[in-house]
A protein has these predicted regions:
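Contiguous beta-strand/loop segments that form the cofactor/metal-binding neighborhood of enzyme cores
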Residues: 1-12, 16-153, 159-187
Length: 187
């Protein structure tokens, strides 16, 4: 079945397909625990193809000392893929370009832009993404028994955040971690 991703029975939509990976980067950088609450709003505004999962969404994840937001839409590619970590000392931006289908590589870069108010002498930096060789890191860690760049615990926390977001969307309300733990699906 080609478009299984469009239906709740088979998929969590773009939240479990993409947000889970993008949120992992932020959760890792900030060493965040499980979110205490999640809220997701959105709808089917662009892709009128019979899908059940939203094509446009905005997710807010509450953590003890910060809030993380994630947005996605299928009807505008102006800003491409990427994440921005906005802090009082500056912004770290992870930019993912299109994958070269011949080389199997994507143009990924990380940029740091200092916040001039708090870091007047800060210097902007551009570097390569540490996830560029993500699969190679995973294979190397199987051989060496070292911890991979994206350990299992990080995947778990990211998955919980994604499922909380979808639960919020489907219930049309903010969902706490405790409510998500107690949730029993009807199927």
């Amino acid at each position: 079945f080609m478009n299984w991703r469009l239906y709740w029975m088979f998929s969590g939509g773009n939240v479990t397909e993409n947000m889970i990976h993008q949120i992992a980067w932020i959760m890792s950088a900030l060493d965040l625990p499980l979110p205490s609450a999640a809220y997701m709003s959105g709808g089917i505004f662009s892709e009128k193809d019979g899908r059940e999962v939203p094509d446009t969404m905005s997710v807010t994840l509450d953590f003890p000392e910060t809030v993380v937001t994630w947005q996605s839409t299928f009807n505008n590619r102006r800003y491409g893929l990427g994440q921005k970590l906005l802090g009082s000392d500056g912004t770290i931006e992870y930019v993912a370009g299109a994958t070269d289908m011949v080389k199997g590589e994507s143009e990924e870069q990380i940029h740091y832009y200092p916040e001039k108010v708090n870091r007047p002498n800060g210097v902007a930096i551009t570097g390569n993404s540490p996830t560029h060789n993500h699969m190679q890191n995973w294979i190397d860690c199987m051989r060496s028994r070292k911890t991979p760049n994206a350990p299992t615990e990080l995947g778990y926390r990211s998955a919980v955040a994604a499922h909380m977001a979808n639960l919020s969307y489907r219930q049309k309300r903010r969902v706490t971690l405790e409510e998500a733990k107690a949730f029993q699906p009807e199927y």
